[in-house]
């Protein structure tokens, strides 16, 4: 793909992301999903737009994907409602680097002290090609990329 086609494609994706979820951005609580046990010690704590999961290791919690920054309060509520304390989250592992999966990473680290984890490829994209995270399409003007701990 040549650079001009890439730029046009990126702009189209960004514009689509900015408009497709306007109601979710304005009213995230409408998309709340009551947390539930999937199997054994694995729980669904996401909403109807972004999947997030929690694993109880017995020695602390591992969370997968932090979702959007603007809906962090829903994830915190879901952790409590699932019967856990967010302060027990030891690791927050991100499946990939798109803003709808990493948006609240820094909030969880700042509030609860958990370690932020992403693949080396994801960390490289955030550092070297941040435009691919689609951060400009994020509803929060304060959203930022995080620096992984591991």
Please name every model-derived segment.
Residues 22, 63-64, 93-94:
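A generic structural signal for short
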Residues 10, 17-20, 49-51, 70, ...:
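Residue-level detector of flexible, active-site-proximal loop/helix-junction positions
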Residues 21-24, 29-32, 39-42, 102, ...:
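Intrinsically disordered, low-complexity segments enriched in polar/charged residues with Gly/Pro
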Residues 1-28:
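Accessory terminal helices/loops
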Residues 1-6, 33-39, 96:
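Short N-terminal helix-initiation segments at or just after the protein's N-terminus
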Residues 42, 70-73, 80-150:
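Active-site HxH/HxHxD metal-binding segment of metal-dependent hydrolases
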Residues 18, 59-61, 90:
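A short, structure-level motif marking secondary-structure boundaries and short turns
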Residues 28-82, 86:
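Conserved beta-strand hairpin/beta-sheet module of binuclear metal-dependent hydrolase folds
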């Amino acid at each position: 793909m040549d650079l001009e086609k890439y730029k046009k494609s990126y702009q189209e994706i960004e514009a689509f992301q900015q408009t497709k979820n306007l109601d979710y951005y304005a009213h995230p609580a409408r998309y709340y999903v009551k947390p539930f046990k999937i199997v054994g010690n694995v729980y669904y704590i996401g909403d109807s737009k972004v999947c997030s999961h929690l694993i109880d290791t017995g020695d602390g919690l591992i969370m997968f994907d932090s979702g959007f920054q603007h809906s962090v309060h829903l994830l915190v509520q879901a952790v409590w409602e699932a019967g856990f304390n967010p302060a027990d989250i030891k690791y927050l592992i991100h499946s990939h680097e798109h803003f709808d999966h990493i948006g609240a990473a820094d909030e969880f680290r700042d509030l609860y002290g958990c370690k932020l984890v992403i693949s080396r490829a994801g960390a490289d994209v955030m550092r070297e090609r941040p435009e691919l995270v689609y951060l400009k399409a994020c509803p929060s003007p304060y959203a930022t990329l995080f620096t992984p701990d591991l």
